[in-house]
Amino acid sequence: KQACYLAKKVKKHLKVPVSLVTSDRSRVTDFYPYEVFDRIIEKRSNNKFSKRYNDGALSHKKLEFNNDLRPLAYELTPYDTTLILDTDYIICNDLFKDVFDTTKDILLYKDSTDITLHRNFTEFKRISDTSIDFYWATCVVFKKTAFTKMFFELIEHIRQEWNHYANLYQLNTRIYRNDYSFSIAVDILKSDNIGLMPGTMLYSTDKDVLFKIEDDKLKFLVEKKDRLGQYTAVYTHKQNVHVMNKFSLNRMIGEM
């Protein structure tokens, strides 16, 4: 559902072909308007992890966490230049229209801000208190070059040797995360072939609730600081947003 919605937004604002990588092709083609995708690429996930997902401040569920296919993006993409997007990253403008002409091999987000513009989540600044800068794997541009091939091979190596790198970089989790592996790869390579995505990564946390979508306007209930279960209304207009509360995103897409 999220992938189909995002594909429509990408085609509206960026006017580029969209392909979907999924572990279950039939689930897409049997239940959703799959014609929005130019290609559907099936690749089975081998993950056995589960993760807690919040739906606002007072509700949560523990669900399967599939994140082992991102290192295979170089191998799977049918394009010479690729924009990778998580399905909970909502495109509401044409900010990315020029990224396909970048002179860099890879573009990533480093700087980020919460939709309130004043909450400060330190976990998105560095991958641990004593470690390296945080780079987002949510939204990535890459070209098919020898350097990029090496970059993604390094990402896969980090994934396979995750316990070693988690210890080396003093991480407080033993569950593999793409954001962390991309950050580690950037630190290891320290290359001018890696650049930054335009603008700033704008996000809402999974303790916030998306309660309305009106074209390119997103309306949220944002958790108040130190006020459990209390919210303030915030909206964004024509801004790309990483909506971490996937449950509320699904509900709003379902009502459209």
Question: Where does each model-flagged region fall?
Answer:
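A glycosyltransferase accessory/donor-loop signature
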Residues: C4, E35-V36, T130-F142, A146-M256
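Short, hydrophobic beta-strand segments that form beta-sheet elements in well-ordered domains
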Residues: P17-D24, L83, L107-L108
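Short, surface-exposed amphipathic charged segments that create phosphate/polyanion-binding patches used
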Residues: R52-L63, N120-R126, F211-D215
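GT-A fold catalytic core of metal-dependent nucleotide-sugar glycosyltransferases
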Residues: N66-H118
